[in-house]
Amino acid sequence: MDGDILMSKILKYKNEMFLFILVVITYLIITKIFFSKTTIFYDLNNTYDVLLDTDTGVLFNLNVFAISQDNSKHILFSAIISIFAYPIYLFCTSIANPGTTDFNSAYGFGLICLQIITSAMSITLVFNHIKKIKMQRLTLILLTMIMIFSFPQLFMTLNVERFIYSQFSLIFFIVIANKMKGKNSYLIELAAIPLFGITISNIYLYFFNMIFEFKLK
């Protein structure tokens, strides 16, 4: 019985699973290409920052992704992301060897892999949401491809920063809020927690949702 339920779920979301795997593989290939040419996406100590000045160097040095070493705005963000990033940090620390494996390279690549998974989840959620609108298949594919290969998405995915987590928290909250519309559930409040840990602009979304829900009632 459980096997039948699992199989039905797989068949129902087979397009989403295929897209998720495709995005992960595509971004890994792009990452491999960039890693062979530059360290810019995880180390800004060099002088060839030709994209734009981000907080990557500061965030990487403070290690806010695994162990926040400052007592400021990064605390909640670190508490959430470290659930996934801390094991990566420990693994990279254990394999780092001055003669063979550079810690910054290993840890930078590990964090980018985590961001690739996060980005793929964001794209998959958007794809699933658009699909429910009954949009033409060609238009759906075109919009998805634009999102995958757009410069903002590529930059947020490859540059070790908080951007991609901010995007995912927004998309995840919107999806949950839409599913729970008109229902009494604490899921919306739970889904809102990451909003408070990344950027203040994300916090506005939670309050806007509260206002709209109140007016609709």
Positions of predicted regions on the chain:
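Helix-to-loop transition at the C-terminal end of transmembrane segments
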Residues: L28-V50
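Short acidic/glycine- and proline-prone juxtamembrane loop motifs at membrane-interface regions
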Residues: L158-I164
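Specific aromatic-rich, kink-prone transmembrane helix
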Residues: F149, Q153, Y165-G182
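Transmembrane-helix signature of polytopic, membrane-embedded enzymes
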Residues: V126-F149
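Transmembrane-helix motifs of polytopic, lipid-linked glycan transferases
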Residues: C113-I133
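Membrane-interface alpha helices of multi-pass inner-membrane proteins
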Residues: S185-F214
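Start-transfer (signal-anchor) and selected internal transmembrane alpha helices
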Residues: M1-F34
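Short hydrophobic/aromatic helix or loop-helix immediately within or flanking a transmembrane segment
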Residues: I67-S105, F109
